[in-house]
């Protein structure tokens, strides 16, 4: 494909136009009185949302230079969303302000490399100040207040606080559609996976078609169980104890399945066979998770273990196992607490290191099943469009609340950035900066005013008036845009997670530095649309 190239000011101005078009669309959603944006879809109903990253993903500009500028800001929103789960609009507003302030100086002749160094130093100093002034989340009410602000809905805040109180920070809170109007909250106890019994003959409770095993042995194997000989040997080990048996394997077929069913029907011993969840390496990892949770050892050819020669030491244990047609739940596995904690730490490290959104999601599901549990918030609304919009807000609020638990809280409404910058501006390290590095730092101190001004503007109040007033207030006090009053924001429950605020600034500063130091842009040349065939062509007359 042919390329087009732009240099210096032409390159930067083309990218800036794309950045502005995206940022101006996103920033109208900022704050408690921010507006929604309607996203047209190629199929189905349109989506109405105030989620910055969802809006950014839908914007695809025609001009190639503008598209590149917009893509850079999309990266700010996406990275902030990946790390903190919220703050995408704040990050976009900060990036726009940093780039505009920086380009003024580049046009005036400043060295962009020196400006970038100053931006990085000031941003790092503000992040340190934000972390130092964070307030730990100590109560369920604080979680509820944080989630309420993110979702703009007190009922949602209460449900999320209840969910996280139950499943813990490592637990998973999922959001699903509800058949009825309103919000419902369900909890899953223990480790649950989406595989049920292989045969309905394993059912012990005819009323709800489930198989319930009390204090069972648990046999985990990575291969298929097909041989009658294997089952006979396992049955001999289990029958000595009189306990029921759960078998989780790649599959149970051949002679093995009818042998198990026949023993179950005759009452020789109570057993249930279930297929292992997942595929390939993910299945192996999940079997190992179950082994650690229950104190079992996975019977695998890789380890030189075969079913016809195992002893009872490979069995795991649990207080109860409940198996339905579609899912299996293991309650209170008997594995070592230390082993479970080590496995949890390993999965956390994998989450930190993966670049794949899909892998991250699957790892978080595994983490929740080991460390916490699963809570499901079911959302119902009058229309499909309203339900989708509410689900988006709840998903953001869940991640916001988790971020608050992880790194603590700050005064919200953009106040924390302004007050942290005011402190950092007077610090010895920043005062010692000189020349264009000092100019770069000054760019950051002006840019961090953008979120509070935008929140005020979206509330119908002058941003400059609010900013000047907040500068005069004691630390922690600021503008509550929901009520248009000045008060102690932490006491009023107007808070932002530190993780969200710092991630927004760090990612915005990173992209702004790249933007300012760009000297040329190589873009794909737009293709001319193919000429339409003339009427009557190739008709033979």
Swiss-Prot record:
Gene that this polypeptide is encoded by: groEL
Gene Ontology biological process: protein refolding
InterPro entries linked: Chaperonin_Cpn60_CS, Cpn60/GroEL, Cpn60/GroEL/TCP-1, GroEL-like_apical_dom_sf, GROEL-like_equatorial_sf, TCP-1-like_intermed_sf
One Gene Ontology cellular component annotation held by this UniProt entry: cytoplasm
Keyword set includes rRNA-binding: no
Organism (species): Gardnerella vaginalis
Compartments, as annotated in UniProt: Cytoplasm
NCBIfam families, sorted: GroEL, PRK00013.1, PRK12849.1, PRK12850.1, PRK12851.1
Enzyme Commission designation: 5.6.1.7
Name of protein: Chaperonin GroEL
Organism taxonomic ancestry: Bacteria, Bacillati, Actinomycetota, Actinomycetes, Bifidobacteriales
Pfam families reported for this sequence: Cpn60_TCP1
Keywords, ordered alphabetically: ATP-binding, Chaperone, Cytoplasm, Isomerase, Nucleotide-binding
GO molecular function: ATP binding; ATP-dependent protein folding chaperone; isomerase activity; unfolded protein binding
UniProt similarity note: Belongs to the chaperonin (HSP60) family.
Chain positions recorded as ATP binding sites: 29-32, 86-90, 413, 480-482, 496
Free-text function comment from the UniProt entry: Together with its co-chaperonin GroES, plays an essential role in assisting protein folding. The GroEL-GroES system forms a nano-cage that allows encapsulation of the non-native substrate proteins and provides a physical environment optimized to promote and accelerate protein folding.
CDD domains per the UniProt record, alphabetical: GroEL
């Amino acid at each position: 494909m042919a390329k087009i190239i732009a240099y210096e000011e032409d390159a930067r101005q083309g990218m800036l136009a794309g950045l502005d078009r995206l940022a101006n669309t996103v920033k109208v959603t900022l704050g408690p009185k921010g507006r929604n944006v309607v996203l047209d879809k190629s199929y189905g109903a349109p989506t109405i949302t105030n989620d910055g990253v969802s809006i950014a993903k839908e914007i695809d500009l025609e001009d190639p230079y503008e598209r590149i500028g917009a893509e850079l800001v999309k990266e700010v929103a996406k990275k902030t969303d990946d790390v903190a789960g919220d703050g995408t609009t704040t990050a976009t507003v900060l990036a726009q302000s940093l780039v505009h302030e920086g380009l003024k100086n580049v046009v005036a002749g400043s060295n962009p490399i020196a400006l970038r160094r100053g931006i990085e130093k000031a941003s790092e100093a503000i992040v340190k100040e934000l972390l130092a002034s964070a307030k730990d989340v100590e109560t369920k009410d604080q979680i509820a207040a944080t989630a309420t602000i993110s979702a703009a809905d007190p009922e949602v805040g209460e449900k999320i606080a209840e969910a996280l109180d139950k499943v813990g920070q490592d637990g998973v809170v999922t959001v699903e559609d509800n058949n009825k109007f309103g919000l419902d909250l369900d909890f899953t106890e223990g480790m649950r996976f989406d595989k049920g019994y292989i045969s309905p003959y394993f059912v012990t409770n005819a009323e709800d078609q489930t198989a319930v095993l009390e204090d069972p042995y648990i046999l985990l194997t990575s291969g298929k169980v097909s041989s009658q000989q294997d089952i006979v040997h396992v049955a001999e080990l289990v029958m000595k104890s009189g306990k029921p048996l759960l078998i989780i394997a790649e599959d149970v077929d051949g002679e093995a399945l009818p042998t198990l069913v026949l023993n179950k029907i005759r009452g020789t011993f109570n057993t249930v066979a279930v297929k292992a969840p997942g595929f390939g390496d993910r299945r192996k990892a999940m079997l190992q998770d179950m082994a650690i949770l229950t104190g079992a050892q996975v019977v695998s050819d890789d380890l030189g273990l075969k079913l016809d020669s195992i002893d009872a030491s490979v069995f795991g244990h649990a207080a109860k196992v409940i198996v339905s047609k579609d899912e299996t739940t293991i309650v209170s596995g008997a594995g070592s607490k230390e082993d479970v904690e080590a496995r949890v730490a390993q999965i956390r490290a994998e989450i930190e290191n993966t670049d794949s959104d899909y892998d991250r999601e699957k790892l978080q599901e595994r983490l929740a099943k080991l460390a916490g549990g699963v809570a499901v918030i079911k959302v119902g609304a009058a229309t499909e469009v309203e339900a989708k919009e509410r689900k988006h807000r709840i998903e953001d609020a869940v991640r916001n609340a988790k971020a608050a638990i992880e790194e603590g809280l700050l005064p919200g409404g953009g106040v924390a950035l302004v007050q942290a910058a005011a402190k950092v501006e007077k610090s010895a390290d920043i005062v010692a900066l000189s020349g264009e590095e000092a100019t770069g730092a000054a760019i950051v101190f002006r840019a961090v005013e953008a979120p509070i001004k935008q929140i005020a503007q979206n509330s119908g109040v002058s941003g400059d008036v609010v900013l000047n007033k907040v500068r005069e207030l004691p630390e922690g006090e600021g503008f509550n845009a929901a009520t248009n009053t000045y008060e102690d924001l932490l006491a009023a429950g107007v808070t932002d997670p530190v993780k969200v605020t710092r991630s927004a600034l760090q990612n915005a500063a990173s992209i702004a530095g790249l933007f300012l130091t760009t000297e040329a842009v190589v873009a794909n040349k737009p293709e001319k649309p193919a000429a339409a065939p003339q009427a009557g062509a190739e008709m033979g007359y």
